[in-house]
A protein has these predicted regions:
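Metal-ion/cofactor- or nucleotide/acyl-coenzyme-handling active-site neighborhoods
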Residues: 1-277
Length: 277
């Protein structure tokens, strides 16, 4: 856990944009609490709080035991009594007109209850999909896949009850930090709103539960809109959007307007700033 002075509440929100790839995040530990998103836990020391909003990631994180080590905020994480297990599973399938799922992911026996409570979610892709090959060419394919994700709840987990604003993971982490930590300052690191290349911008692209490294950049207008809502709803908090540098790369573009409680700084400026505090 962090070694920071709790009398001054500083939060670092860590996104998974590629701008943070070579930035040593361990330098932040003594200066504030670290809120991170999704697969951050895979290759970094555990943050103080982990946020995930997609069922593929929430169940991965739970199955890895992370939710028993640190507080985790998961979307659609409703714990159901075990007698509902088969009924809920069949309900997911019947809504898709299927007798059997295409993939079932669980941390226990797929047929028998192994605990008092469980969380179950489904993910369906149905219709015509555009498939991108590694050489950049594409082709059309009809798909109809239903994946079901299940987690048997084990004692001592730190999943949280919370008010979900419905944002993507980054802005959701910002919302949670402001609501429950009452911070003085919030720093956005690796929260890239654009891509410097013609490809998807994410450190974990191409890995399990992430889009292919060959995908086009994600449309990000909704991300910007969500962050602006976080700024406006927390006027008393000073926000810093930490870019890798101040050059003209797309990831360094000042896309979040000129909100009075928002300032743009570089990673180098962040380190200088923390030395003074």
């Amino acid at each position: 856990m962090s070694e920071y002075n709790a009398s001054y509440r500083r939060i670092f929100i860590i996104g998974n944009g590629e701008s943070r790839k070579d930035f040593d995040l361990t330098q932040l530990r003594k200066h504030g609490k670290i809120y991170a998103c999704n697969a951050y836990y895979r290759d970094n020391p555990l943050p103080d709080v982990l946020v995930a909003v997609d069922s593929t990631m929430t169940h991965e994180i739970y199955h890895k035991g992370i939710a028993h080590k640190i507080p985790c905020y998961f979307r659609e994480w409703t714990k159901c009594p075990n007698f509902m297990y088969q009924t809920m599973k069949q309900g997911f399938l019947s809504t898709q007109g299927k007798d059997k799922e295409d993939k079932f992911v669980t941390n226990g026996d797929s047929a028998l209850p192994i605990g008092d409570y469980f969380v179950m979610n489904s993910h369906t892709i149905k219709g015509e999909a555009t498939i991108r090959r590694e050489d950049g060419t594409t082709y059309k394919k009809m798909v109809d896949n239903t994946h079901i994700y299940n987690s048997w709840i084990t004692p001592g987990d730190k999943t949280q009850e919370w008010e979900d604003p419905g944002y993507h993971a980054g802005a959701t982490a910002g919302h949670i930090a402001c609501k429950y930590e009452n911070p003085n300052e919030v720093y956005l690191i690796g929260m890239d709103l654009r891509s410097d290349t013609k490809y998807y911008n994410n450190i974990y692209k191409g890995s399990k539960h992430y889009s292919s490294a060959h995908y086009e950049p994600s449309p990000t207008g909704i991300w910007e809109s969500e962050w602006l809502q976080v700024f406006k709803h927390n006027r008393w908090v000073k926000f810093y959007k930490v870019n890798k540098s101040d050059d003209d790369k797309l990831t360094n573009t000042k896309l979040l307007g000129d909100e009075q409680n928002l300032e743009y700084i570089t990673q180098a400026q962040l380190l200088d700033l923390l030395k003074q505090k």
